[in-house]
């Protein structure tokens, strides 16, 4: 069911997120309702909408019925991993997002859709981030993180073997920089 590349990436999943949680010094914060003006929320929604359209087009073009469960698995993984908050100094918490790993496995376009699904469910059912701020939260965590993480992963790992430790370092760097940039 999984390709050799996907299997190799999943092999490093536990190590990657263990290291990521230990070294996380920034927070991917959900923006609540009332923090942004309605005009800003609308603009952020307009900014994220083209990325959703690109992701949906990519899913339609490249995914088949056999691979659709992978998107659901990545969305569920992102949803679950965002529920584990790590206390940070200053009275706030941080959490892993799962967007970097999703981008490495299926590409940043499809990862945007998977993470957006998780964020929308969290906003509507758990109050984690505001409903009006869905565009801003999806832009910060479902667009910025996957695209930056994927670019860094590709630049650092280049054509190394799938079981190379360089790929683990590339995944860590991509995830860490992606979360850091997404937090700003």
Task: Please name every model-derived segment.
Residues 53-60, 86, 122, 126, ...:
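Membrane-water interface at transmembrane helix exits
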Residues 23-101:
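Hydrophobic transmembrane alpha-helices
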Residues 1-16, 36-41:
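N-terminal membrane topogenic signal
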Residues 42-43, 68-73, 112-116, 168-173:
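Hydrophobic alpha-helical transmembrane segments
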Residues 82-145:
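Alpha-helical membrane segments and adjacent membrane-interface helices in multi-pass membrane proteins
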Residues 4, 30-37, 59, 63, ...:
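Membrane-helix interfacial "entry" motifs
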Residues 141-183:
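Short helix-perturbing small/polar motifs within transmembrane alpha-helices
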